[in-house]
UniProtKB/Swiss-Prot annotation:
GO CC entries: plasma membrane; proton-transporting ATP synthase complex
Membrane topology: Peripheral membrane protein
Identification of the protein by name: ATP synthase epsilon chain
Source species: Azoarcus sp. (strain BH72)
Family named by the database record: Belongs to the ATPase epsilon chain family.
Function, as annotated: Produces ATP from ADP in the presence of a proton gradient across the membrane.
HAMAP family the record matches: ATP_synth_epsil_bac
Length: 141
């Protein structure tokens, strides 16, 4: 029997995933993080991107797009507190491409530093979402 860790992925709106996993991978602030059972305690910010969960006794990984947030790792428990979280199967490529286009337009027409920072964040989120969609389509997790 494989070792597991309990994983909770939650957003402000709802709980997206809760269950036992053999492995979790996600975009940390300093790069891609891989969490296995028994990982040392850790708390860090996460960047927009795909959280991949290798669920116990399941061939396919669960994929959840997060728009940033916090990761907390404790013995036996991994918690992802996401600003926004969308199940991989619910991602909409057309909406993501439209969000990217609008963010690029806002960057070109910014009227203040605040507008520029907001547009940069929206662009980074849209690009990460598109990358997650493309990886899902190709079967690359």
């Amino acid at each position: 029997m494989a070792m597991t860790v309990h994983v909770d992925i939650v957003s402000a709106e709802e709980q997206i995933f809760s269950g036992l996993a053999e492995f979790v991978a996600l975009p940390g602030e300093a790069g891609e993080l891989g969490i296995l059972p028994g990982h040392m305690p850790l708390m860090t910010r996460i960047k927009p991107g795909a959280v991949r969960v290798k669920v116990q006794n399941q061939a396919e990984e669960e994929v959840v797009f997060v728009a940033g947030g916090l990761l907390e790792v404790q013995p036996g428990l991994v918690t992802v507190l996401a600003d926004t979280a969308i199940r991989g199967k619910d991602l909409d490529e057309a909406k993501a491409l439209e969000a990217k286009r609008k963010a690029e337009e806002a960057l070109a027409n910014q009227s203040s530093q605040l507008d520029y920072a907001k547009a940069q964040a929206e662009l980074a989120e849209a690009i990460a979402q598109i990358a997650a969609i493309q990886r899902l389509k190709k079967g690359i997790h």
